[in-house]
Design a protein with these regions (language model features):
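Structural detector for internal amphipathic alpha-helices that build alpha-solenoid repeat scaffolds
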Residues: 208-210, 232-246, 257, 265-278, ...
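Non-catalytic accessory/interaction domains
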Residues: 84, 97-283, 293-294, 298, ...
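Solenoid-repeat scaffolds in large eukaryotic assemblies
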Residues: 86, 344-345, 377
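Hydrophobic alpha-helical and helix-loop surface patches within well-folded domains
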Residues: 1-152
């Protein structure tokens, strides 16, 4: 039972593989990012080993460590070994232990057999250890030597060793450096450059299960977003630039680009991060509210327009009331309440709250209470 994660982590990671196959890598990476964040959200999880020999209750094993963190660890293994060795190793593990029980050591032996690599270092810290790296990344440029030094400091108590990707952006081009971080407090890596790099970006694909603190200017976040090819760097750039929107031109440029991003989760995140008065973004928001192919994005865009309290959007809100999407319907009703409160009662009374989703109900409740729509209030 202590090795429960050997089963449950694959259940978690199978979802990643399905999302990757069915919906594409961006969607799979988004779900993985959210899954790992959910695991980290409970501070108790940091102190739990993945393989636990001491637990108070069998049911305690069904948690964000056995599932979410375990799935993230498998993803690291896949990327360290490569697809061919990883999946061949899994095949060997299944055949070798067919009709029997499985333990983490047996998984390690199969992966070592196929890959030819010693994986004790990996399993000792990730399967039989707790926590994850908490890093502080800083860089300094030496103009005389034409070198940049990247300092990676581990601030957690138990130190890890791991491979780490570092992107160096120079003259608009990314050079990816692959380094090995040893299990000590500080590691320095020196790279030859022609000038002070525009950006240093550690763990650009979010492959390493970690928390990384790295100060970046709005301009650097804009460069990170516009040069990144993966979801993680784009998504986190949007998140980190949020507080500078409408205050810094590079943050504004980043959000203007994100509202047009090909991946809908990035468009949605940008909409959610807009300030209360999004004047310079309204043209793009209107297009999303009218034409976006994803109802979640369309609904969020309508929600942004509702906050402007501009009556010119009333036809758009009234059209949205008839949408199938709960997001579009709920935000449209909120918009009507803002610009034409005399109409909101009539529209709200026609919505069937019994069959409505929880999200729609939560959106509508403030409108119902504020406007005293008695027909939708419980007796």
């Amino acid at each position: 039972w202590s090795n429960l994660t050997v089963n449950e982590s694959f259940a978690d990671y199978s979802e990643y593989l399905w999302n990757e196959y069915k919906y594409g890598k961006d969607e799979a990476d988004y779900k993985r990012l959210k899954s790992l964040r959910n695991s980290k959200a409970d501070p108790r999880n940091f102190g739990k080993d993945l393989v636990r020999f001491n637990y108070e209750s069998r049911e305690d094993m069904f948690d964000g460590v056995s599932y979410n963190k375990g799935g993230g660890i498998l993803h690291m293994l896949r990327n360290y070994l490569g697809d061919d060795a990883f999946f061949a190793g899994l095949s060997d593990y299944l055949k070798t232990n067919e009709y029997g029980t499985g333990e983490a050591h047996q998984l390690r032996l199969s992966l070592e057999k196929v890959s030819g690599k010693d994986l004790n270092w990996f399993f000792n810290q990730w399967y039989f250890g707790k926590g994850y790296p908490k890093l502080e990344v800083k860089s300094t440029f030496d103009p005389m030597k034409k070198q940049v030094t990247v300092n990676v400091a581990q601030t957690q108590e138990e130190k890890f060793e791991f491979p780490l990707s570092i992107d160096v952006l120079e003259n608009g081009k990314i050079s990816r450096k692959e380094v090995w971080v040893t299990a000590k407090s500080k590691n320095d890596f020196v790279f030859d450059v022609t000038k002070n790099p525009e950006l240093i970006n550690a763990n650009p694909e979010g492959l390493l299960l970690s928390d990384i603190k790295q100060d970046k200017t709005p301009e650097q976040l804009f460069l990170q977003y516009t040069t990144a090819k993966d979801l993680y760097s784009k998504y986190t750039a949007i998140e980190e630039a949020k507080d500078q929107v409408s205050k810094n031109p590079f943050a504004d440029k980043l959000y203007a680009a994100a509202l047009k991003d090909k991946f809908y989760r990035n468009r949605l995140l940008a909409l959610e991060g807009l300030p209360e008065d999004p004047k310079s973004f309204l043209a793009d928001v209107e297009k999303l509210a009218q034409n976006d192919e994803k109802n979640l994005v369309k609904g969020a865009a309508i929600g942004v327009l509702a906050k402007t309290k501009n009556p010119k959007y009333l036809p758009l809100f009234e059209k949205g009331i008839n949408a199938i999407s709960n997001s579009v319907k709920g935000n449209s009703l909120s918009g009507i309440a803002q610009v034409a409160p005399e109409k909101v009662v009539n529209y709200a009374e026609k919505i069937d709250l019994e069959s409505a989703s929880e999200d729609l109900v939560m959106t509508l409740l403030p409108v119902i209470v504020k406007n005293k729509i008695t027909a939708q209030m419980p007796n």
